[in-house]
């Protein structure tokens, strides 16, 4: 955010505005220019690493642009407590930020502490994200076009074994098993092997070649397929937005059109967004009455299917197509699926979503600082999908489907919010007072329907609808949800003499989600501030331009973790266990009945988080150096947990209770420095760091076994719920002597993982030798931004990082193991890292020997999979040029800027030590959609 005089910056803080200088709470801010850098269809993705204490993670390179936002660590155990999103003053129930055009956003404020967020009460324990969209400005008529084209490609794909390497690895595993376990050599039929036995009787490979044909019909030719190369592509994305705005003293309006097409780097995947927005405002009766509306309509289409997993494990010897042009399987291997077929056959099964969101409002200036506002907001969504699955087979493979079907799904969430406020403003002498009182009523309704039917007469998508299928109907389903909130709230801000600040908030919320015993709760908050720099005794400190102390305490609630209806005992009709021969017939139809889903608890109440904040804001050298440092402590009580199954209660005997407590504390630091603004070469450096430490302080005894620990001697209490728990791997058995001298460990053998006997009883077992081996919580996270400007050129570089966390590297199960029971069946392909596995010819390797026999149980959680998840990424670098006015004036333009940018340029990770990260991206240690490198070329023009 550009640094301006503090008195100019006005911040929207929920139902009212304040000068930034008068803030006593913790608020992070971003404006439209911040969002343009590293622009994305999801605004929060653009802000990753740019706000202290706001931890944003992405879903890799998935074109559907999903993000997860966590403000100041965990606030619940349910995993469902997300920040409340407030759009143009309307709290939302079902808004994903990819649903709206990020180019329409004027500013984003994140309310981090309880004092700031408590005005939203029961839904604010996860923080609050306030979004204001752009409005027309008085006296200005602008036509603005922003457009860009991007090229996306995955540079950091895993390097997999080719066909020959796979064949050699298969032989190596068989030779090891024969020598260590005494098994006989059995090689894959897809290869022709030439081998002999050496003088010591050990199997020695001479040559391996892929068979010319993999099946007896000679329709599947042996190949050397790069499956990653087959499913990945260089993709082109487009982003275009046209905005027209104007205004006068009597009216202001803004109209925008947007189109975003993000083609995925996996074939036949994409995300498209079509958007339209109209924001208007009219002043009537000599400016005593103001009416207006904010309305946005978006239509989304997306296919976010990822087949990275199948591309990684499919044998390279199998081709994509058979000799007749049909889909090929994997003859001679295990049960595999052709990933190109999966992506191609589903390419027209598109997810569709329509979002209509907006509000109408009326402001009435009653008399001398007294005003009233009423606002009615609506948020409607319509999700629908029609999936057509045709008959298919993979030649030579084990997979086929002789049935076709059509499946349809629809869901219609609707929420509306009616907010009424009465405001009073008083400014006299040294006193400034702002008060707001209000009521808010919210209702959410959702209905959904799904159906699937076999027997498509004609496999043509235009024809294939459920109504014209001929098979039996099955998997009919429906869903419904409804709940309401009613709230009373008030807030007062008081400033004395421009330097003593006081704020108080209270909100009382009621929700139909709770039983009558605990339907209402009250959430208060208080905060104070002291602008020390404005004191007389600070006049001699000329180098100090700002110094303010802040302190706050407040309470927030959470209902997001509460499963719908868990205060009552619901019943359901399910496919299994609910149909009975009511008439006693031994044949004929079974009549559908009901079964209990869970046992209700009418005494469930709100999860409540109290939070204390202490902070200092500072500025030096006429605000050229600014920043803030803050500490917070959060305590959440009455956290919802589900108790274990109680057999005597029968089906659904798993009630929810308020039973857990948790503490969370951390530090936040922000700093920004700019050089002399009159210099020809200008630069600004901004950085932020956030930390959080989470500890569970209480769990019911009958629940504690559901969390890491053994439940006997080693408990999660006092630790984060995000810890990892397992055995300690102690290298590889490299000699038979090491095997013989080690503690009793079922399955131990030369070339296998050695586990520590922590309790010293001479036996490695799961009960007494597991311990805490890491945490997914980082030590700190943040980002640093460099902005440079020389004449008409500008350069922006943004680095983002996470440090001190551990990850469970799921890739390692493929890259380090030829076979793991239940996880990595024999026959799958692997990254080339496995070629360096331990063998009698490679005894110094720390990768376990390749084997088809797994008696050492190496798939279990241990430090072997726990690696350092720290990283530093150059997220974005952008070079722009703004044409001088003498050129743009001739072209009847107000502004013209062109730019080129690169996103996801490089990643630095730990590459040394026992806990080094051995895969390619610590941010995504699973098998998801790989993150692409993106080059963007764009144009901003204003008329």
Descriptions of predicted regions:
Residues 215-218, 228, 470, 511, ...:
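Extracytoplasmic gating/loop element in the C-terminal half of outer-membrane beta-barrel translocons
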Residues 144-217, 449-452, 564-565, 674-776, ...:
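Conserved small-residue
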Residues 85, 494, 756-758, 788:
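Short aromatic-centered micro-motifs
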Residues 775-809:
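Glycine-rich, aromatic-lined ligand/substrate-binding cores of catalytic
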Residues 130-132, 615, 670, 785-789, ...:
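Residues within well-ordered beta-strands of beta-sheet-rich folds
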Residues 8, 34-37, 81-82, 238, ...:
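Extracellular/periplasmic, surface-exposed regions of secreted and cell-surface proteins
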Residues 4-278, 283-284, 290-292, 328-329, ...:
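Short, small/polar-rich motifs associated with maturation and membrane association
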């Amino acid at each position: 955010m550009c640094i301006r005089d503090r008195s100019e910056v006005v911040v929207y803080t929920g139902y009212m505005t304040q000068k930034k200088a008068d803030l006593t709470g913790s608020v992070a801010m971003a404006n439209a220019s911040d969002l343009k850098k590293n622009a994305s269809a999801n605004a929060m993705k653009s802000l990753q690493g740019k706000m202290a204490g706001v931890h944003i993670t992405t879903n890799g390179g998935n074109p559907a642009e999903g993000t997860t936002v966590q403000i100041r660590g965990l606030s619940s155990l349910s995993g469902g407590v997300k920040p409340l999103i407030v759009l143009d003053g309307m709290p939302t129930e079902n808004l994903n930020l990819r649903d709206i055009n990020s180019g329409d956003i004027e500013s984003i404020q994140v309310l981090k502490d309880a004092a700031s967020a408590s005005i939203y009460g029961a839904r604010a324990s996860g923080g609050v994200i306030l979004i204001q969209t752009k409005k027309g400005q008085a006296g200005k008529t602008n036509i603005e076009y922003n457009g860009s084209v991007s090229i996306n490609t995955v540079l950091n794909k895993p390097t997999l074994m080719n066909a020959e390497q796979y064949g050699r690895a298969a032989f190596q595993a068989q030779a090891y098993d024969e020598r260590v376990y005494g098994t006989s050599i059995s090689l894959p039929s897809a290869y022709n092997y030439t081998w002999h036995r050496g003088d010591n009787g050990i199997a020695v490979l001479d040559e391996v070649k892929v068979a010319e044909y993999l099946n007896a019909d000679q329709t599947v030719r042996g190949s050397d397929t790069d499956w990653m190369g087959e499913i990945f592509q260089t993709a082109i994305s487009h982003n275009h937005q046209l905005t027209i705005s104007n205004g006068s003293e009597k009216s202001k309006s803004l109209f925008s059109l947007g189109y975003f097409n993000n083609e995925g780097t996996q074939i036949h995947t994409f995300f498209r967004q079509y958007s339209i927005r109209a924001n208007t405002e009219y002043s009537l009766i000599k400016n005593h009455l103001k009416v207006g509306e904010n309305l946005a309509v978006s239509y989304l289409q997306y296919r976010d299917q990822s087949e990275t997993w199948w591309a990684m494990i499919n044998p390279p010897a199998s081709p994509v197509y058979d000799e007749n042009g049909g889909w090929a399987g994997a003859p001679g291997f295990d049960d595999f699926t052709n990933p190109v077929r999966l992506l191609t056959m589903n390419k027209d099964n598109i997810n569709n979503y329509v979002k209509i969101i907006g509000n109408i409002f009326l402001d009435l200036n009653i008399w001398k600082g007294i005003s009233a506002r009423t606002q009615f907001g609506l948020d409607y969504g319509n999700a629908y999908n029609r999936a057509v699955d045709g008959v298919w087979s993979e030649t030579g493979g084990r997979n086929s489907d002789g049935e076709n079907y059509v499946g349809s799904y629809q869901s219609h969430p609707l929420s509306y919010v009616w907010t009424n406020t009465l405001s009073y403003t008083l400014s006299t002498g040294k006193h400034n007072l702002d008060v707001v009182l209000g009521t808010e009523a919210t209702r959410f309704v959702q209905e959904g329907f799904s159906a699937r039917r076999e027997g498509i007469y004609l496999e043509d998508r235009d024809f294939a609808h459920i109504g014209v299928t001929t098979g039996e109907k099955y998997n009919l389903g429906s869903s419904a949800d409804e709940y309401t909130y009613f709230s009373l709230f008030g807030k007062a801000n008081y400033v004395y003499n421009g330097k003593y600040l006081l704020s108080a908030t209270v909100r009382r919320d009621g929700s139909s989600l709770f039983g009558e015993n605990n339907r209402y709760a009250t959430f208060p908050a208080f905060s104070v501030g002291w602008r020390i720099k404005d004191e007389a005794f600070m006049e001699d400190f000329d180098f100090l331009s700002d110094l303010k102390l802040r302190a706050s305490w407040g309470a927030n609630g959470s209902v997001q973790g509460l499963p719908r209806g868990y205060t009552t005992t619901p019943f359901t009709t399910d496919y299994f266990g609910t149909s009975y021969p009511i008439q006693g017939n031994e044949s004929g139809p079974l009549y559908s009945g009901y079964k209990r889903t869970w046992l209700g608890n009418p005494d469930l109440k709100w999860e409540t988080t109290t939070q204390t904040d202490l902070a200092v804001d500072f500025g030096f050298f006429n605000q050229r150096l600014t920043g803030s440092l803050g500490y917070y402590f959060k305590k959440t009580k009455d956290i919802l947990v589900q108790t274990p199954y109680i057999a005597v209660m029968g089906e659904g005997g798993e009630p929810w209770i308020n039973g857990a407590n948790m503490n969370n504390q951390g530090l936040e630091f922000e700093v920004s420095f700019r050089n002399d603004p009159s210099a020809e070469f200008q630069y600004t450096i901004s950085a932020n760091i956030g930390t959080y430490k989470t500890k569970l302080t209480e769990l019911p005894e009958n629940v504690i076994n559901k969390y890491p620990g053994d439940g006997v001697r080693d408990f999660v209490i006092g630790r984060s719920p995000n810890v990892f728990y397992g055995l300690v791997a102690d290298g590889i058995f490299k000699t038979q002597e090491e095997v013989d001298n080690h503690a009793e460990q079922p399955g131990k053998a030369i070339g296998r993982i050695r586990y520590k006997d922590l309790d010293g009883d001479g036996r490695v077992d799961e009960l007494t030798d597991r311990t805490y081996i890491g945490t997914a919580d980082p030590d700190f996270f943040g980002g640093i931004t460099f902005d440079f400007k020389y004449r008409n050129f500008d350069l922006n570089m943004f680095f983002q990082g996470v440090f001190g966390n551990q990850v469970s590297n799921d890739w390692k199960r493929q890259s380090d193991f030829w076979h793991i029971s239940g996880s990595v069946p024999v026959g799958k392909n692997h990254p080339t890292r496995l070629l360096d596995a331990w063998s009698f010819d490679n005894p110094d390797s720390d990768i376990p020997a390749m084997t088809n026999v797994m008696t050492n149980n190496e798939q279990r959680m241990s430090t072997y999979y726990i690696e350092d998840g720290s990283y530093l990424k150059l997220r974005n670098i952008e070079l722009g040029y703004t044409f001088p006015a003498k050129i743009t004036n001739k072209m009847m333009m107000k502004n013209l800027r062109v730019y080129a940018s690169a996103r996801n340029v490089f990643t630095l990770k730990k590459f040394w030590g026992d806990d080094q990260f051995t895969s390619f991206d610590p941010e995504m240690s699973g098998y998801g959609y790989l993150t692409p490198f993106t080059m963007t070329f764009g144009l901003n023009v204003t008329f």
